[in-house]
């Protein structure tokens, strides 16, 4: 049984790593008006089409020592880190949701809820990378996140109201604040929290916003202290919101229980 669990864990890890590898490609292609679903992956230096042995998550980068097998160009460690993160989050989603809403015959012990959560994590990866590069969040990614939220409501239709409230409880105040303070939040950030709120429900949405503000505030203080930005400069807030969403999704229940007990 232990050997089987280890094998299933490895498969889940590779599934998450493969998804994040693809979403990394999405994050690179979308800002460049390239179709993420068309065309094979190529080496950015020599343009050689990558074969199956070059695309095995994690192991290809390690086996090739971070270099293209054709031209020897260095492959950024970001690719390895993204795939490792995807693997870890796949295990985290399985731990959090298990086989809830199990698939017929099962899928490596993962149910619909765990797979949906992993898909949300993959979308948030692309959102974070694109926002960090361009300070914009593509509408199609927010739409994909909203679809995940709608599916989560369909999986548990009796709990639809907390999800609807979640879509509004943070996004509406963000929008109203923008009416008072020009540029307080980007439009993409507002849509992001509306879509994420539909998936999370209102309690975890508030928690996600809290963590996003804390992380973003700490980064802003660092930029000011290091004199890398002025008081009126803007920076991408999306990555911090995404981090808050993932934390709330995986650990929201225990954190809220601890907070209520503390009160």
Predicted regions and their residues:
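Interfacial loop-to-transmembrane junctions
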Residues: 222-247
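Structural signal for membrane-spanning alpha-helices in multi-pass inner-membrane proteins
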Residues: 24, 28, 90-97, 124-131, ...
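Short, conserved phosphate/pyrophosphate- and ester-handling motifs at nucleotide-, phospho-/glycolipid
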Residues: 20, 189, 236
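Hydrophobic positions within alpha-helical transmembrane segments of bacterial inner-membrane proteins
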Residues: 17, 21, 171-172, 213, ...
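Transmembrane helix-loop junctions in multipass membrane proteins, especially transporters and channels
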Residues: 29-37, 95-103, 132, 157-158, ...
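Membrane-proximal soluble regions of multi-pass membrane proteins
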Residues: 23-78, 237
């Amino acid at each position: 049984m232990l050997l089987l669990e280890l094998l299933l864990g490895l498969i889940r890890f590779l599934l998450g790593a493969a998804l994040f590898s693809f979403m990394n490609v999405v994050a690179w292609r979308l800002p460049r008006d390239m179709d993420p679903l068309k065309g094979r992956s190529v080496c950015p230096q020599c343009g050689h089409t990558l074969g199956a042995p070059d695309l095995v998550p994690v192991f290809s980068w390690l086996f090739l020592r971070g270099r293209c097998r054709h031209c020897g160009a260095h492959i950024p460690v970001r690719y390895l880190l993204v795939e490792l993160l995807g693997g870890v989050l796949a295990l985290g989603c399985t731990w959090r949701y298990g086989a809830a809403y199990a698939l017929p015959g099962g899928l490596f012990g993962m149910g619909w809820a765990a797979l949906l959560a992993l898909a949300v994590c993959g979308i948030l990866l692309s959102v974070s990378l694109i926002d960090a590069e361009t300070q914009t969040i593509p509408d199609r990614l927010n739409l994909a996140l909203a679809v995940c939220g709608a599916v989560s409501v369909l999986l548990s239709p009796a709990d639809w109201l907390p999800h609807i409230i979640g879509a509004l409880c943070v996004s509406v105040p963000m929008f109203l604040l923008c009416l008072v303070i020009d540029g307080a939040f980007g439009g993409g950030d507002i849509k992001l929290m509306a879509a994420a709120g539909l998936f999370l429900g209102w309690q975890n949405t508030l928690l996600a916003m809290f963590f996003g503000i804390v992380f973003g505030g700490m980064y802003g203080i660092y930029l000011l202290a290091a004199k890398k930005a002025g008081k009126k400069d803007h920076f991408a807030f999306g990555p911090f919101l995404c981090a808050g969403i993932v934390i709330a999704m995986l650990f929201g229940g225990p954190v809220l229980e601890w907070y209520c007990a503390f009160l």
